[in-house]
A protein has these predicted regions:
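Short, solvent-exposed loop/turn segments at secondary-structure junctions
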Residues: 51-55, 126-130, 170-174, 213-217
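A Trp-anchored, charged/polar loop motif used as the substrate-binding/catalytic surface
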Residues: 21-36, 94-108, 143-156
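Proline-aspartate-enriched helix->loop->beta-strand connector
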Residues: 153-171
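Active-site and ligand/interface coordination hotspots across diverse enzymes
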Residues: 1-92, 156, 196-200, 237-244
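Surface-exposed cleft-lining segments at the edges of enzyme active sites
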Residues: 63-73, 89-93, 127-145
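Short mixed-charge
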Residues: 88-116, 185-203
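C-terminal capping/extension of enzyme domains
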Residues: 1-15, 137-154, 172-244
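Short, contiguous, well-structured surface segments enriched in hydrophobic/aromatic residues
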Residues: 113-126, 130
Length: 244
C-alpha cells in the first residue's frame, strides 16, 4: 500500500511526465523516488545522481528499479555500490577506516537494504532517456535549464522531505546555480573536507553535499565514503557508531 508521500510522488511524476512528453516527444521519462522503508528511517537520505550522456549507463537500472515490487537491485555496479556504502555509513554515523574495513560488500549490504535497517530515496538530475540510443547531452542541458523542470525538481525534494541530500557533481554542470536562483538552495561557506566540493542548504535547514559523480574514478573510501560520511556526521550531529 502506498503511503501519502508515495501517492503524492506518483501524482507529481504523472504531471512531470506529461510535460516532458509534450516538450521532448522522442525521449523516455524515467520515474524515481523512494525505496521501501525510506520514511521509517531515523535519518532520511536523498541521493541525486547525474546520468552519463548515453541511453545506457550504470545508473539507469537503479532509477527504473525504484518502481519494482521488490527491494534491492540487480547487477550492482560502481554507481549503485557507492550509494549503498554511503547510505549505510551516513545512517549509522560511521566514517572511520575501521568502520570501512568491517563493512560488508555491496551485494551483502543490498540484502539488508530497503528494510527498517537502512534505506534511501533517489532522484536523477534529468528524468529523460533517448529512445534511439543517441547522445542525450543537448536534451540533458535543455532539461536542467528549463524553469518548469526546476520547479518540479524542487517539489519532489519537498515531498521526499529528507534529512540530508548527497548529489553527484551537479555543481560542475551549472545545475546547483540554477537551483540557487529559486531561492530554495543556498551555498554554505564550508567546503567538503579536503575536496573541492561545496556544501549547500535546502530551504535553509537541510544539508546538501555535492560531491563527485557517483561513477567517478575515485577510491571508494578516500574519495567518497570517508569525506562524505564525515561531513554528514558533522551536519547531522551524529556520533560515530561502533556497530556493524
Amino acid at each position: 500500500m502506498k503511503t501519502e508521500m508515495g501517492k503524492n510522488i506518483e501524482a507529481l511524476m504523472k504531471k512531470w511526465a506529461d510535460y516532458c512528453h509534450r516538450k521532448w516527444p522522442k525521449s523516455i521519462f524515467v520515474k524515481d523516488g523512494a525505496f521501501p522503508c525510506y520514511e521509517d528511517q531515523q535519518t532520511k537520505i536523498l541521493f541525486i545522481g547525474r546520468e552519463l550522456y548515453g541511453k545506457k549507463n550504470d545508473g539507469d537500472g537503479l532509477v527504473i528499479n525504484y518502481w519494482n515490487e521488490r527491494a534491492g537491485m540487480d547487477n550492482l555496479g560502481v554507481f549503485q555500490s557507492r550509494l549503498l556504502y554511503l547510505a549505510y555509513g551516513i545512517s549509522k554515523g560511521q566514517c572511520t577506516e575501521a568502520h570501512w574495513k568491517k563493512m560488508q560488500c555491496a551485494t551483502e549490504l543490498d540484502c539488508r537494504f530497503a528494510t527498517e535497517e537502512f534505506s534511501y530515496a533517489f532522484m536523477n538530475a534529468s528524468k529523460l532517456l533517448n529512445v534511439d540510443g543517441t547522445q542525450i547531452g543537448d536534451v540533458f542541458y535543455d532539461f536542467i535549464n528549463d524553469k518548469t523542470n526546476q520547479d518540479f525538481f524542487i517539489r519532489e525534494i519537498e515531498l521526499l522531505n529528507p534529512d540530508i541530500i548527497v548529489s553527484g557533481n551537479l555543481g560542475d554542470i551549472g545545475f546547483m546555480a540554477k537551483l540557487e536562483e529559486s531561492g530554495k538552495v543556498k551555498q554554505s561557506a564550508k567546503h567538503l573536507n579536503n575536496q573541492n566540493r561545496f556544501n549547500y542548504l535546502f530551504e535553509g535547514k537541510i544539508p546538501w553535499i555535492d560531491t563527485w559523480h557517483f561513477s567517478a574514478h575515485k577510491a571508494h573510501f578516500e574519495g567518497f565514503y570517508q569525506p562524505v560520511c564525515e561531513a554528514a556526521a558533522i551536519f547531522l550531529g551524529k556520533e560515530q557508531g561502533t556497530t556493524d
